[in-house]
């Protein structure tokens, strides 16, 4: 949901995250200055969380805070029983963690850098030669699409519609660091530029059989800007995951297990579901209030969610993981 361009929902999420951050800072400060965590009014904190269920901005929430030893110092959950009638929400509930997958993928990349397998200034084409000749899209006037999108006046009128796009050659080398910093030029189908978004949606990237097919489809699409020119949120970390795979000869799923979850004995973070894993429904805030998502409503790159099946062989480093709080 954080990838949708929904102003009302964004306001809810920003305010929610501010309040949760305040809670986290309070607990962090207390735990650093005392041998025991002091909670003077747990009900007041619970009420703060519940408010986001009651006002319709969230379908469910789980807040789980731990100290540095891994002991929980606060936990609370709530849900909209009409939207989630049959599932209990607790530390063992499996969530699609969406863009939090990016942190895991980047951590693996930095681990590979430490091992001398990757360098941050390596060209991406060293590992993904299919992207060496990728093109760059401009507005029909030949100006930058990122500049067009970031101009608020362009959201209010179709007078300066940038379509049809002008396609030019890539002028700079794309690097691994640019993938990490979202400066490589990739995007989601949420730019608001129909001729750009529709091209990505038609490719249905999430329906690729594996990362090779994903790259084959992606390489036909233009970048939204020259690599290194501006940061723009999108599929950059997903491509970074493929770099990790190509550099090691292992799948991203294997890399997560070998370098993170198994050494650290983490059981609640993975790609594919287990046999008995039940995922929560997918929700949308398209109407400025949370509800069950309609088919294709979260259409950020074609099919609106990655595959989570046991036999899935496509691992999205930017969107595809599932996890629990515990």
Spans of features found by a protein language model:
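Extracellular/periplasmic catalytic domains that process cell-envelope and extracellular macromolecules
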Residues: 55-57, 88, 119, 168-173, ...
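Short hydrophobic targeting helices and cationic amphipathic motifs
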Residues: 6-9, 13-16
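Short, conserved catalytic-motif segment at the N-terminal edge
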Residues: 39-95, 117, 133-140
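C-terminal motif of bacterial Sec signal peptides marking the signal peptidase cleavage site
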Residues: 30-31
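Sec-dependent signal peptide recognition
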Residues: 18-23
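Short, surface-exposed loop or secondary-structure junction motifs
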Residues: 134-326
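Methionine residue identity
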Residues: 1-3
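Active-site SXXK
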Residues: 49, 69, 96-124, 237-245
């Amino acid at each position: 949901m954080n990838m949708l361009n929904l102003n009302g929902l964004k306001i809810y999420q920003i305010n929610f995250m501010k309040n949760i951050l305040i809670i986290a800072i309070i607990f962090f400060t207390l735990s650093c200055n005392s041998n025991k965590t002091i909670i003077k009014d747990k009900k007041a904190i619970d009420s703060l969380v519940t408010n986001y269920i009651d006002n319709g901005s969230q379908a469910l929430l789980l807040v789980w805070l731990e100290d540095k030893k891994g002991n929980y110092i606060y936990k609370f959950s709530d849900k909209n029983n009409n939207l989630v009638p049959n599932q209990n929400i607790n530390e063992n509930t499996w969530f699609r963690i969406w863009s939090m997958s990016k942190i895991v993928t980047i951590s693996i990349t930095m681990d590979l850098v430490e091992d001398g397998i990757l360098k941050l200034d390596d060209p991406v084409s060293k590992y993904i030669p299919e992207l060496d000749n990728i093109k760059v899209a401009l507005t029909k006037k030949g100006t930058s699409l990122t500049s067009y999108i970031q101009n608020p006046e362009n959201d209010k009128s179709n007078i300066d519609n940038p379509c049809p796009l002008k396609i030019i050659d890539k002028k700079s080398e794309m690097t691994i660091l640019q993938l990490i910093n979202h400066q490589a030029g990739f995007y989601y189908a949420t730019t608001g530029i129909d001729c750009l978004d529709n091209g990505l949606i038609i490719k249905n990237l999430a329906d690729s059989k594996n990362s090779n097919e994903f790259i084959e489809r992606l390489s036909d699409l233009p970048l939204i800007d020259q690599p290194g020119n501006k940061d723009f949120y999108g599929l950059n970390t997903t491509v970074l995951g493929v770099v990790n795979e190509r550099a090691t000869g292992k799948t991203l799923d294997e890399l997560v297990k070998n370098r993170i979850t198994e050494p650290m004995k983490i059981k609640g973070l993975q790609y594919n579901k287990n046999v008995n894993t039940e995922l929560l429904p997918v929700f949308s805030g398209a109407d400025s209030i949370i509800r069950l998502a309609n088919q294709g409503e979260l259409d950020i790159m074609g099919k609106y969610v990655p595959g989570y099946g046991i036999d899935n062989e496509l691992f999205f480093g930017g969107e595809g993981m599932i996890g629990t709080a515990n």
